[in-house]
A protein has these predicted regions:
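Short coil turns that delineate tetratricopeptide repeat
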Residues: 57, 91-94, 128
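TPR alpha-solenoid repeat register
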Residues: 62, 96-99, 133
């Protein structure tokens, strides 16, 4: 009787442990999204970044990367929302400047030059050394 009980408990622990090994973290989803993005598989990257955000809604890197994937697919209005969210959540000013820079790029592409300049100024306030933003 004890032997059967021991086997049942052991199998239960193995099953529970196995599901934890399969569970993905938001960082893993971001890495998968980055691989897809580098391969120019924008829709696949978008899916992976959305999975990362589902795991952790407060991850500014996942949100920023989602914005980049959306921008690559020419989904500018959705990308703007993601860049804005990433800028609000990001504590690192250099990464925050990237969000503002990309918002400026979107506005410039839509010929909203005054708005683009404001976003570029915000990016430069965060990172005055960013020559690409200064050039735009």
């Amino acid at each position: 009787m004890n032997y059967i009980h021991y086997i049942i408990v052991t199998v239960a622990f193995l099953l529970v442990g196995g599901t934890n090994a399969v569970a993905q973290t938001d960082r893993n989803w971001i890495r998968q999204g980055n691989r897809a993005f580098k391969s120019q598989k924008w829709a696949a990257a978008e899916t992976q970044y959305r999975k990362a955000i589902y795991k952790n809604q407060k991850n500014p890197q996942a949100i920023y990367n989602l914005g980049c994937a959306l921008l690559a697919q020419q989904k500018d209005s959705l990308a703007m929302v993601q860049f804005g969210n990433a800028a609000q959540l990001e504590s690192n000013i250099f990464r925050r400047s990237k969000s503002y820079h990309n918002m400026g790029v979107v506005m410039q592409n839509h010929r909203e030059y005054a708005q683009a300049i404001e976003y570029y100024k915000m990016a430069l306030r965060c990172n005055p050394q960013d020559n690409e933003t200064r050039y735009n």
